């Protein structure tokens, strides 16, 4: 009998006895390998989930049987799971020029509440070392509804794309609407952050510079709420002094006009703030995570905001110990946040922790290693939260030490110290009751 079953059985046998709060553990999570083919090396996964039990995972897939450190001829794969059951699996990229060192790398995925997935990645199909941002819109059954290039101009380098998807469609619920952001490098000019908004799979509403045009700007992320507006964060050095903050703005649905003035998500300005991650819920409340070393010790920090852009609390350190890097964040419809990160080192580990809307941790997912095993190397951690407080995670795993990674998917975590069965969660969803 599992811990979950025992708790639920006790509550049924003894009247008015509620299950005692129990910290979630990795053993309570259902683990599966996201990629169905183990050949080669799978890297840099990303994950999204919606309110209806669907989870989408994307990754780089290099089927070469040698040199796992070399991402030449990597393709982009997408797999959808419905209530934990595998659905479709698709190769979305189109290879490249024969004999060339082509690559498709750094994918990201978003998912609306109907189950439509949007995937973006950096593509170099001719192997000339110059990347553009490709996207695909995929239906709940795995049909490609639209494809294209997010950036209008091929000039320069377009790298590190991210995508946010309107959960209920915009401008109508029948549409698939999304925003794409990326880092744009033109020759020797400092990098900027670009954003493009789409109101349908092939209907582009705008392309704008999301960051300031002065200074240098890197590695954006984006989240889209039901309003259709795009929240954008990035590594910002607008004054070109070499010190980075976390830039933050919001762009209008149809025009890309700035509707939340450009500002910094972090209040502490000492040291370096980098690798921003953002997530928004249906109402537009959002949370931001990033790396910071302003205390003298690098760690992962987070801060939550209202839909109007007002901070709910000062930034809080989420990680414990040293070596925490590359945060990933999620938020539910009760404004509870969850933050994941990788602990760097010879044998990296992946961790997660939950936060209340005010930045406290009582009652939320306890800080812990959240992987199937801690043997060997686990890294490239990504997570997503549903409106109900469910948490899905993925990461790359090399527990056998052969240097070839697989993508592990973990389902069944909740951002709460109260464990519940899948049946109980479905009943709560049917009643419209938050899991808080």
Q: Each predicted region: which residue ranges?
A:
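C-terminal cell-surface addressing/anchoring modules of secreted/extracellular proteins
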Residues: 414-436
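Extracellular, repeat-based ectodomains that mediate carbohydrate processing or recognition
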Residues: 21-417, 436
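Intrinsic disorder/low-complexity segments in short proteins, especially the signal peptide
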Residues: 12-13, 17-18, 256, 360, ...
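Secretory targeting and sorting signals
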Residues: 1-23
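Absolute N-terminal positional cue centered near the fourth residue
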Residues: 4-7, 27, 52, 423
């Amino acid at each position: 009998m599992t811990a979950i079953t025992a708790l639920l059985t006790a509550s049924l046998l003894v009247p008015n006895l509620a299950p005692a709060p129990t910290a979630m553990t990795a053993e309570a999570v259902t683990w599966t390998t996201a990629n169905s083919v183990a050949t080669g090396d799978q890297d840099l996964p990303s994950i999204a989930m919606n309110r209806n039990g669907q989870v989408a995972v994307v990754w780089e897939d290099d089927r070469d049987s040698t040199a796992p450190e070399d991402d030449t001829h990597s393709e982009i794969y997408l797999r959808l799971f419905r209530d934990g059951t595998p659905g479709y699996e698709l190769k979305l990229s189109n290879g490249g020029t024969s004999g060339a060192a082509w690559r498709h790398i750094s994918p990201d995925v978003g998912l609306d509440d109907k189950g439509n997935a949007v995937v973006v990645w950096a593509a170099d199909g001719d192997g000339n070392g110059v990347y553009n941002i490709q996207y695909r819109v995929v239906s709940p059954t795995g049909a490609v509804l639209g494809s294209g290039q997010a950036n209008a101009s091929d000039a320069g380098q377009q790298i590190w794309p991210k995508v946010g998807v309107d959960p209920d469609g915009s401008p109508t619920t029948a549409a698939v609407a999304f925003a794409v952001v990326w880092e744009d490098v033109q020759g020797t000019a400092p990098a900027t952050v670009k954003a493009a908004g789409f109101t349908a799979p092939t209907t582009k509403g705008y392309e704008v510079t999301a960051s300031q045009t002065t200074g240098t700007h890197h590695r954006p992320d984006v989240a889209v709420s039901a309003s259709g507006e795009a929240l954008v964060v990035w590594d910002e050095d607008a004054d070109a002094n070499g010190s980075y903050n976390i830039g933050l703005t919001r762009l209008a649905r149809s025009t890309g006009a700035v509707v939340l003035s450009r500002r910094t998500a972090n209040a502490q300005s000492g040291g370096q703030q980098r690798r921003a991650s953002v997530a928004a819920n249906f109402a537009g409340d959002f949370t931001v995570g990033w790396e910071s070393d302003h205390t003298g010790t690098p760690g992962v920090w987070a801060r939550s905001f209202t839909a109007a852009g007002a901070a709910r609390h000062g930034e809080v350190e989420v990680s414990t110990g040293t070596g925490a890097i590359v945060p990933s964040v999620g938020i539910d419809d009760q404004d509870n946040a969850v933050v994941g990160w990788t602990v760097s080192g010879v044998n990296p580990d992946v961790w997660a922790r939950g936060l209340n809307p005010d930045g406290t941790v009582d009652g939320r997912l306890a800080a812990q290693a959240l992987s199937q095993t801690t043997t060997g190397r686990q890294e490239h951690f990504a997570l997503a939260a549903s409106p109900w407080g469910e948490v899905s995670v993925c990461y790359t795993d090399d527990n056998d030490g052969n240097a070839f990674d697989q993508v592990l998917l973990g389902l069944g975590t909740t951002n709460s110290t109260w464990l519940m069965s899948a049946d109980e969660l479905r009943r709560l969803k049917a009643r419209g009751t938050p899991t808080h």
